């Protein structure tokens, strides 16, 4: 009887284990003044970005990154995407599900 209880408990734990996402595609290109990366996982998550070093070698040197990331809500199946720019003005995300500040 104890064996059956332990077996059922272990089986329940194995079935309840969350599925881990695997990387299905990964591409990157890194150069001294620009870079890009593209990653996609088996659960529908993807991340893409491109960056460039602006004004390299000067006092005004800054990285400018354009990118996006997407994920799928496990419970609802809804797909979310954020696109963004990150530069000397900060991180500026946009997405259909994000609130928009009113125009002053």
Curated annotation (Swiss-Prot):
Superkingdom: Eukaryota
Annotated signal sequence range: 1-18
Start and end residues of each Chitin-binding type R&R domain: 32-102
InterPro entries: Cuticle_Struct_Prot, Insect_cuticle
Keywords: Cuticle, Signal
Record Pfam families: Chitin_bind_4
Coiled coil (residue ranges): none
GO biological process: chitin-based cuticle development; larval chitin-based cuticle development
Cellular component terms per the entry's GO annotation: chitin-based extracellular matrix; extracellular region
Molecular function as annotated in GO: structural constituent of chitin-based larval cuticle
Role: Component of the cuticle of the larva.
Protein name, UniProt field: Larval cuticle protein 65Ab1
């Amino acid at each position: 009887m104890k064996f059956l209880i332990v077996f059922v408990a272990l089986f329940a734990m194995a079935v309840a284990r969350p599925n881990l996402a695997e990387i299905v595609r990964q591409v990157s290109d890194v150069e001294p003044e620009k870079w890009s990366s593209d990653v996609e996982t088996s659960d529908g998550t993807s991340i893409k970005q491109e960056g460039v070093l602006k004004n390299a070698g000067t006092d005004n040197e800054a990285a400018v990154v354009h990118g996006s990331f997407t994920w799928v809500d496990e419970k609802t199946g809804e797909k979310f995407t954020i696109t963004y720019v990150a530069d000397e003005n900060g991180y500026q995300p946009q997405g259909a599900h994000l609130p928009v500040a009113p125009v002053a």
